């Protein structure tokens, strides 16, 4: 059995196994743990009462967190004409069509979000094998294929998160950075859960939000007492 590092031992001493934590208590405790050598994110995992093997129970959406994620988001937009001007005015880092596709084929993929207007999908369709595995392929279900590219850019820059249930029916997403105020972090999580409830599949039975776990990038996951959340 591998020995625990000094950091892991310090963390283990502060965590109470089997406990469900009040949200603010969990956020404060995680922020107080020995830090990694970079600014960690707060991440949340939500176990949902769905069967992701059934297509009508795959939960997938996007929502703008009220306080963002603390991350600088680079956005590329496939569009042309007046929409291209609107995307640039909204803060897009790169806007184009065939020339942008050529750049991406050449390996320039330093973007966090890729957005496309419907008329640009003839170009974007060539990039499926490049963008798909990286989770960057535009999709109307999460608002990244839209005629209103300017609003999509603003949402991405404002801290919109995209999520989809994994094979175990769990969604994972970042909800802030270590320096976030606990109240703002809580409001971000509440907004996420409210959005999950909004798109609950009609065929989902029983308890829908089964468990909420808060963690930091390199830290442990703490189960949250859902009664401490207003969602």
From Swiss-Prot:
Source superkingdom: Bacteria
GO process annotations (BP): regulation of translation; translation
Keyword field: Repressor, Ribonucleoprotein, Ribosomal protein, RNA-binding, rRNA-binding, Translation regulation, tRNA-binding
GO MF, any single term: tRNA binding
Record carries keyword ATP-binding: no
Cysteine disulfide links: none
Entries under Pfam families matching the protein: Ribosomal_L1 (PF00687)
GO cellular component, one term: cytosolic large ribosomal subunit
Record's keyword annotation contains RNA-binding: yes
NCBIfam families: rplA_bact
Entry similarity comment: Belongs to the universal ribosomal protein uL1 family.
SUBUNIT field: Part of the 50S ribosomal subunit.
Described function: Binds directly to 23S rRNA. The L1 stalk is quite mobile in the ribosome, and is involved in E site tRNA release. Protein L1 is also a translational repressor protein, it controls the translation of the L11 operon by binding to its mRNA.
PANTHER family membership: 54S RIBOSOMAL PROTEIN L1, MITOCHONDRIAL, LARGE RIBOSOMAL SUBUNIT PROTEIN UL1M
UniProt name for this protein: Large ribosomal subunit protein uL1
């Amino acid at each position: 059995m591998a020995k625990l590092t000094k950091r892991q031992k310090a963390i283990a001493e502060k965590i109470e196994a089997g406990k469900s934590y009040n949200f603010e208590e969990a956020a404060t405790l995680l922020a107080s743990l020995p830090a990694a050598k970079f600014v960690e994110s707060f991440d949340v995992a939500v176990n949902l009462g769905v069967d992701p093997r059934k297509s009508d129970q795959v939960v997938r959406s996007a929502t703008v967190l009220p306080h963002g994620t603390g991350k600088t988001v680079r956005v590329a937009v496939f569009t042309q004409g007046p929409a291209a001007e609107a995307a640039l005015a909204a803060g897009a880092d790169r806007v184009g069509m065939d020339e942008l596709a050529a750049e991406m084929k050449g390996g320039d993929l330093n973007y966090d979000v890729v957005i496309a207007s419907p008329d640009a999908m003839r170009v974007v369709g060539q990039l499926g094998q490049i963008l798909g595995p990286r989770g960057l392929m535009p999709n109307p279900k999460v608002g990244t294929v839209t005629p209103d590219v300017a609003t999509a850019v603003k949402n991405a820059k404002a801290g919109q998160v995209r999520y989809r249930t994994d094979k175990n029916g769990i969604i994972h997403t970042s909800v802030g950075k270590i320096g976030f105020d606990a109240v703002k972090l809580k409001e971000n999580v509440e907004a996420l859960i409210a959005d999950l409830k909004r798109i609950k599949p009609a065929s989902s039975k029983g308890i829908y939000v089964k468990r909420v776990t808060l963690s930091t990038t390199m830290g442990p996951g703490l189960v949250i007492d859902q009664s401490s959340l207003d969602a």
